Regions:
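Cleavable N-terminal signal peptides of Sec/SRP-targeted secreted and luminal proteins
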Residues: 2-21
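Residues that form ligand- and interface-recognition hot spots within folded domains
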Residues: 5, 63, 76, 138, ...
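Residue-level detector of bioactive/disordered segments in secreted/extracellular proteins
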Residues: 7, 21-23, 31, 50, ...
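Extracellular secreted precursors and ectodomains with disulfide-bonded cysteine-rich loops/domains
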Residues: 17-19, 27, 46, 157, ...
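Signal-peptide-cleavage-adjacent N-terminal segments of secreted and extracellular proteins
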Residues: 19-70
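Short, His- and charge-rich active-site/binding loops that engage polyanionic ligands
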Residues: 51-130
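Domain-level detector of nuclease and nuclease-like folds
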Residues: 109-298
């Protein structure tokens, strides 16, 4: 789609008053949260991520940081090859009355409202950070759903030493574990943790860089014959990963024997309660990821 066509879609949608309320309310996509209960304690702009007229996952977006606090989704075992990246943006962040389907970035200049409202591709060009998925394509079955994860509203600046190393290993581990032992729906929430001083940004205060990434899943219905090493991985599992090799080791220690390119980007697995303790400490408020900590009670 040309730059002119993208502008026409956005402007016509605004003029016509189309609004599916995909931005500003999680109500249309509560199915991606355990017990229809979004995480509590974090403030931001809810996005029901819609691709080809289907809701695929949910994101809590921080407009001032131009990056997500978390993305929430239902795990499904992947099929086929990883899609070729076709990066997209959220039109309703720029124009609230626009159509809610994510749109591929056009070649050439972008509408300034889009640039002002969210991260755009030039933010990552010539930076030392990769585009780190919160909701990874690996955790989805259909090609369409996997393709939908390639939106910059689902991405944080992530060091390649993390993205291509320990964090990728975590995503693969979660994929194998849920695929083999989760018998029902598996709800996953993956998010970012800011620096305490919040002074790390891309391109002159355009996009905030997180110090850590975190992830947790809730699978209330799982097999009875779990391997001994996985008995503490159900019904919940959580982890925090380093995104700065120079961060202190209070939260995640460093394995000094790791390969040089991955050293300092360790991932620490922990109980859900421990993750929420670290989130409370960094965000200075109680953060609850799952309803009743995925206890299954009503």
């Amino acid at each position: 789609m040309s730059h002119r066509c993208v502008l026409a879609v956005v402007v016509l949608a605004f003029a016509a008053g189309w609004c599916m309320c995909d931005v500003g309310d999680f109500a249309p996509c509560l199915q991606f949260f355990y017990k229809s209960w979004p995480p509590k304690g974090l403030a931001g702009t809810p996005i029901c991520q819609r691709h080809i007229n289907q809701y695929v996952f949910a994101t809590l977006y921080c407009r001032p940081r131009r990056s997500p606090w978390f993305s929430a989704y239902l795990y499904s075992a992947p099929a086929g090859k990883r899609p070729t990246a076709s990066w997209k943006f959220e039109p309703q962040l720029a124009y609230p009355a626009a159509d809610g389907n994510m749109i591929p970035f056009p070649p050439g200049p972008l509408d300034q409202n889009v640039v002002d409202s969210q991260a755009v591709e030039p933010d990552y060009i010539n930076s030392t950070y990769s585009r780190g998925h919160l909701n990874p394509s690996l955790h989805h079955k259909s090609h369409e759903n996997r393709s939908a994860t390639f939106t910059l509203t689902n991405v944080v600046p992530q060091k390649s030493g993390s993205n291509d190393g320990p964090w990728e290993d975590l995503e693969q581990t979660v994929n194998r574990t849920l695929g083999a032992y989760c018998l029902g729906e598996a709800f996953v929430v993956t998010g970012s943790i800011p620096y305490q001083n919040d002074k790390h940004w891309l391109h002159n205060h355009r996009v905030a860089v997180p110090e850590y990434m975190w992830s947790a899943y809730c699978c209330p219905n799982y097999t009875d014959n779990l391997p001994e090493k996985l008995k503490d991985a159900f019904p919940t599992f959580a982890a925090i990963g380093r995104n700065d090799r120079n961060s202190t080791e209070e939260i995640v220690p460093v394995d000094k024997t790791a390969k040089k390119q991955f050293r300092g980007y360790d991932v620490k697995r922990m109980p859900l309660e421990t993750l929420e303790m670290y989130l409370k400490d960094r965000f200075s408020t109680v953060v609850s990821v799952f309803y009743e900590q995925c206890s299954g009670s009503d």
